[in-house]
Amino acid sequence: MKYKGLTKTTKPFSSAAALLVLAFALFFSIVSPVSAAPLHDESPAGMPGLTLQEFAAQLSTAPQGKPAGLYVANTLALPIVQQPAGQPGFVSSQAGVTTQFGMAEKYGTTGLLAHNTLAGAEFSKLETGQFAALVYSNGETRHYRITAIDRYIASEPRSAYSDFLDSDSNRITAAELFKRVYQNGDDRLVLQTCIANDGIASWGRLFITAEPVTELVVAALSQAAGAVQMTSLSMPLAK
């Protein structure tokens, strides 16, 4: 990918927009972890050898209506923690977990955040066509298929108000990027982490988007009973 040169611009922000940008752009700041939905035996959460059923059995109870774990066969199995009230930029610094992005939930999207030095490193291993599952404490499992992987460069990596460049060198604000990624709703799943480059931990952003799949796909996965490696299957998306 080729990116054009960057120039600094200054734009006015309303207080609401500033809050959104701070929540979206500052999530990579390391903060103290919260304790929620850990694995009972504290085994490595990213261990790809776990089956979905084994992973679900090890999860602790999550808040009502919240996902307790993220699972991608042969790739990752991560418990999910929640952001503390009033901390929209919080991302856990606990190894082997991912954090649900509360602001994204308001727009019908399940957003999961992780530092690229921790569980976010597992996100970079994912590929389009793979299936992901969200596990809930009540036994419910929601299945998704990864449909897009997008990368953006921060024009000012150390600024909370940085603009971003997409792969075509189009420049957009953090608020515009948030809208593009999270405000489409439709029960999408989005995984977000930072991209490190040239010694800068927050040089860019990685977004992995997954769409809900039909009951037909869920049935096929159940029949496979773990024998099928869930990669690059051509299945219809839910409507």
Each predicted region: which residue ranges?
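Membrane-interface motif at the C-terminal end of an N-terminal transmembrane signal
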Residues: S29-A37
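Alpha-helical hydrophobic membrane-insertion segments
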Residues: S14-A17
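Bacterial N-terminal signal peptides
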Residues: L19-S29
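N-terminal secretory signal peptides that target proteins for export/translocation
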Residues: M1-T10
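Solvent-exposed, non-transmembrane regions of membrane-associated and secreted proteins
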Residues: A36-K239
